């Protein structure tokens, strides 16, 4: 497609000439960076293919299984594929795990008992986990079962306070939870290497403590996963990275055999464990999504870096910045006002293939302590590997952008978000012209 054809198509989708030119100039400056993402995607794609071949995935794995799900070949083989790809002893990969929060709650409840203590050495957890833990009172929380919680605040640079972590470890500490991604914060997302250093520090002092990593938004961003650097469990959602945009539901937990067995008994029933839980016809999408995931994540990473560079040049604080290494697919942009957050999200929604005509508004979403706006014209409801953006309507008024099943769609979404902010009067068109 030549430049004239490109501009014409973007114009049909509501992008002004100035915004299109700004996008083209930004993309041109990122060619070397994008090549690095392509190389990581190639490595991870081969890793997934090897795991599938090693575990003899066959057409029979896609068969519809109902009822109890005894001897569900597709389900059992897929769990072996995940364990192979993530280099763990075992995995639990199920449509009955409804989301990332459910997977995390399951892993915690399965491996903690009354009197145990849960420690977060990375500060406050993601908002929805506050009710799981009992930071905000909720029915069925860990706190109701006599499980205590403490957290160690991060240093000013967003990294680990090792002396405070050492002081927080005590005889009650049973499990340490490490959130890889920033969530609704402006701290850094952590590299696998940094997570490995933290785990090694904890294990040197308490080898018996379980180290669990919330791996949401991080799968296939790097060539290794937290399970390669000492994590006892990694946990994630199939409507994020590993589902590749095709999985319609599901979550996974991968790690040590005993811990995964505990999770299986908690998910189903003591005595039943992994033996039940029919796959109900979703296996082909689970396999195919996992196969495509490295390439899809690559497109999302390109979109995140593109967004960082687009908004950083306009003077907005972005985390990570346009040049930093990437450790998840989330791009935070601090817009400084509710109007900015809303206009950004409306632009993302307008770029969607589904529900592009819908105008998102902030609302009191369950599990959050403030109104939240979410833009996601997705094929799978709530899928954040698809083009999406969200943010709480509270200071510092940051928006969190992620996903895009293809780089082209991620690019369109960012340009539409900028166009939306210009149309709403949040960003001046004169400022865009200055950057051309």
PLM region descriptions:
Residues 312-435:
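Conserved C-terminal alpha-helix-loop-beta "cap" of PLP-dependent enzymes
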Residues 64:
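Aromatic- and Gly/Pro-rich donor/ligand-binding loops
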Residues 4-27, 31, 38, 48-54, ...:
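Conserved PLP-enzyme active-site core in the AAT-like
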Residues 1:
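Interfaces and regulatory segments of ATP-dependent nucleotide/adenylate/phosphodiester-chemistry enzymes
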Residues 85-88:
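Flexible linker/loop signature enriched in Pro/Ser/Thr and Pro/Gly
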